[in-house]
Amino acid sequence: MFPWLRLFAVGLSLIGKSKVDLLATTRVRLRVWPNDLDFNLHVNNGRYLALANIGGAHWFVRTGALGIFRKHKAFPVIGGAIAKFRHDLKAFQTFEIHTRLIGWGSKWAFFEQRFVRKERVLGVVAVRAVAKAQSGSIDPQVLIAELGHNAPSPELPEWVRRFDQSAELLGELLRNEERSKVVDQHSMSALGQERTYAVQTATSASHLIATAKAAACTRSYLLHPRQRTCAVQTPMSAKGQ
């Protein structure tokens, strides 16, 4: 089933369901369909991220976070993800996605999503997400407080801190590469302008010299009409060749 249809079906299943605590683990049950499979006849690695989005949407509704986001006209943006695959999911097997909020900082909130079948963890997806609004990013603590949770974030596990650090380092690397490309483009543009100016200057100088020689030749002919005409190309005649 296409993820959007799955998402719609999950939304219908949530009608009338009560809210759960912000730090509770939400569970949504799904089934593997043929379009989830790759050539090895198990769920494609990239498909796990699409399925994890469904688990994330389920968490947003069950905890009431969706209403708070709407109030602020904000939307969640994933700024990094890692995945660990342990066992296969095959066609038509049922499984659950267990989603929980691990903790948060001044910008990012961290989620863990486990793919579970018969109480066995088949894989894990972890993401860091930020709340975006027209005014910019919203501090997670502001949104979490509006959900009635005033306590500080639980301590982040070591692997989550390393994941966050790795994402920051990679982001900085990409930003530096973009800056280098911009500098290189500006340098090439400036070099091209310098070359164009040099060519224009040389051309202007050549025209001035040719014009001066033509004027001297004309003056000599007027003073000494019986002498042979000077063989000097004027700028106009040079251009026509």
Q: Predicted segment positions?
A:
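HotDog/MaoC-like acyl-thioester-processing domains
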Residues: 1-16, 22, 89-96, 100-184
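Short structured motifs
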Residues: 14, 79-86
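Short amphipathic
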Residues: 24-33
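Active-site helix/loop of acyl-thioester processing domains in fatty-acid/polyketide metabolism
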Residues: 47-70
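Short, intrinsically disordered C-terminal tails of secreted or membrane-associated proteins
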Residues: 233-240
